[in-house]
């Protein structure tokens, strides 16, 4: 699988439910049901991605469980516990030109308004008020920083996002 075809992880398979191979689902989508909008899924089993189809799913108390094609026993389901669930990037909804997915920001250089290279976006954290970029500082950072946290607030701290050029322009003090 080429790097631009690497699956986008949307969740993971949890523990078994019952004796007929059903599995609990942990979804990373905005709503739990959102993960079922995509078909087929890719499951990462023993380090390899393989295609699988969801036959049916339902709420079971507060959990969501699913029946997967080819998984008909508890023993087989146990082998899939904790496997990642992914989809191909082209299965994701197309976005307007000025929007992007979080995954598109990972690896972007973060430059402030004075031209200082603050580092590379390593991950994004969702907080109650706004998302936060966790920026891994360059090895020889002038301010001795290892990591920076930059609030993702467009127009205030985030001035420009260039997904194609892998750069984010920020109004942020590099010593903060």
Curated annotation (Swiss-Prot):
Metal-binding recorded as keyword = no
Q: Which family does it belong to?
A: Belongs to the RimM family.
SUPFAM superfamilies, alphabetically? Answer: PRC-barrel domain, Translation proteins
Q: Which chain positions lie within coiled-coil regions?
A: none
Single Gene Ontology MF annotation: ribosome binding
Gene encoding the protein: rimM
Q: Any notes on this protein's domains?
A: The PRC barrel domain binds ribosomal protein uS19.
The GO cellular component terms are:
cytosol; ribosome
Q: Which UniProt keywords apply?
A: Chaperone, Cytoplasm, Ribosome biogenesis, rRNA processing
Tell me how this protein assembles.
Binds ribosomal protein uS19.
- Give the protein's biological function: An accessory protein needed during the final step in the assembly of 30S ribosomal subunit, possibly for assembly of the head region. Essential for efficient processing of 16S rRNA. May be needed both before and after RbfA during the maturation of 16S rRNA. It has affinity for free ribosomal 30S subunits but not for 70S ribosomes.
Name under which the protein is recorded: Ribosome maturation factor RimM
**Which species?**
Shewanella oneidensis (strain ATCC 700550 / JCM 31522 / CIP 106686 / LMG 19005 / NCIMB 14063 / MR-1)
Q: Which GO terms describe its biological process?
A: maturation of SSU-rRNA
Query: Does the keyword Chaperone belong to this entry?
Result: yes
- Principal subcellular localisation of the protein: cytoplasm
What taxonomic lineage is listed for the species of origin? Bacteria, Pseudomonadati, Pseudomonadota, Gammaproteobacteria, Alteromonadales
**Domain of life the protein comes from:** Bacteria
InterPro entries in the cross-refs: PRC_barrel-like_sf (IPR011033), PRC_RimM (IPR056792), RimM (IPR011961), RimM_N (IPR002676), RimM_N_sf (IPR036976), Transl_B-barrel_sf (IPR009000)
Q: Which residues form the PRC barrel domain?
A: 97-176
Any Pfam family: PRC_RimM
Instruction: List locations, semicolon-separated.
Output: Cytoplasm
């Amino acid at each position: 699988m080429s790097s631009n075809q690497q699956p986008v992880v949307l969740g993971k398979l949890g523990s078994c439910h019952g004796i007929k191979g059903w599995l609990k689902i942990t979804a990373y989508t905005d709503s739990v049901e959102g993960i079922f909008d995509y078909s087929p899924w890719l499951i990462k089993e023993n380090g390899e991605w393989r295609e699988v189809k969801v036959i049916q799913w339902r709420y079971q108390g507060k959990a969501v469980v699913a029946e997967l094609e080819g998984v008909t026993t508890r023993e087989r389901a146990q082998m899939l516990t904790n496997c990642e669930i992914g989809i191909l990037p082209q299965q994701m909804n197309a976005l307007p030109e000025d929007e992007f997915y979080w995954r598109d920001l990972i690896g972007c250089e973060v430059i402030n308004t004075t031209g200082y290279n603050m580092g590379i976006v390593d991950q994004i954290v969702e907080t109650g008020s706004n998302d936060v970029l966790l920026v891994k500082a360059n090895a020889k950072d002038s301010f001795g920083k290892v990591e920076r946290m930059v609030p993702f607030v467009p127009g205030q701290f985030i001035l420009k996002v260039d997904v194609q050029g892998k750069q984010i322009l920020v109004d942020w003090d590099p010593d903060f």
